[in-house]
């Protein structure tokens, strides 16, 4: 079984409609709510309700803010690793690293046929909706530059941590909803849901 995880109603409804139209089988769709605890607890509860070897892959689908210049609303990011941007456990842990856990969590994206529609990069997760250039730059300054953070969200690393502990392959696919590095962030976010979301999520759904 493949488990698809979303956070918000808007994301959930778009994915649910597409799965029904495509008559996709052996797939479960979850909506956990926004944030790290909601994401981790929602996925953990589901995994506890099924036989351990039934789930072969977890795919998180949702939105993220861009963390690099040039990314536009509607662009699609495939996470190649996941980290927290709001965690500090002291030395010798890296910034963003939960003690006893990897500094970054791995991604299983080998099943995706990569092309020019998608960009690989690290997705940084924290319990904050990031809206300004200053916030993005502070996050990137806090984390090691080698992470190549290109998007910021509120769920991916928490889901990746659950999958890491369970030994389940995990992939996060994020559609860029806005770029806080640009002054038009507020308008971008509103315009994304009005004009671009359905088209962008259709691209993502065809991967599933």
Where are these regions (language model features)?
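Glycine-rich phosphate- or other oxyanion-binding loops that anchor nucleotides, phosphorylated ligands
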Residues: 13, 17-208
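Extreme N-terminal starter segment of soluble prokaryotic enzymes
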Residues: 1-3
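Gly/serine-rich nucleotide phosphate-binding loop at the start of the catalytic core
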Residues: 5-8, 12
């Amino acid at each position: 079984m493949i488990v698809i995880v979303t956070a918000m109603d808007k994301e959930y409804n778009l994915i649910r409609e597409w799965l029904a139209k495509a008559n996709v089988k052996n797939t479960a769709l979850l909506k956990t709510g926004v944030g790290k605890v909601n994401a981790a607890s929602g996925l953990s509860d589901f995994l506890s309700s099924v036989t351990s070897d039934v789930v072969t892959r977890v795919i998180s689908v949702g939105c993220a803010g861009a963390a690099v210049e040039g990314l536009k609303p509607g662009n699609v990011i495939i996470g190649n690793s996941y980290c927290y941007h709001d965690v500090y456990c002291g030395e010798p842990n890296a910034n963003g690293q939960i003690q006893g856990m990897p500094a970054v969590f791995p991604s299983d994206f080998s099943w995706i046929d990569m092309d020019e529609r998608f960009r690989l990069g690290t997705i940084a997760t924290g319990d904050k909706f990031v809206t300004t250039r200053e916030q993005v730059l502070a996050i990137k300054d806090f984390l090691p530059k080698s992470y190549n953070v290109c998007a910021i969200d509120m769920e991916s690393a928490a889901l990746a941590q659950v999958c890491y502990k369970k030994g389940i392959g995990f992939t996060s696919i994020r559609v860029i909803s806005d770029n806080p590095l640009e002054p038009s962030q507020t308008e971008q976010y509103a315009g994304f849901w009005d004009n671009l979301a359905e088209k962008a999520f259709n691209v993502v759904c065809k991967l599933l």
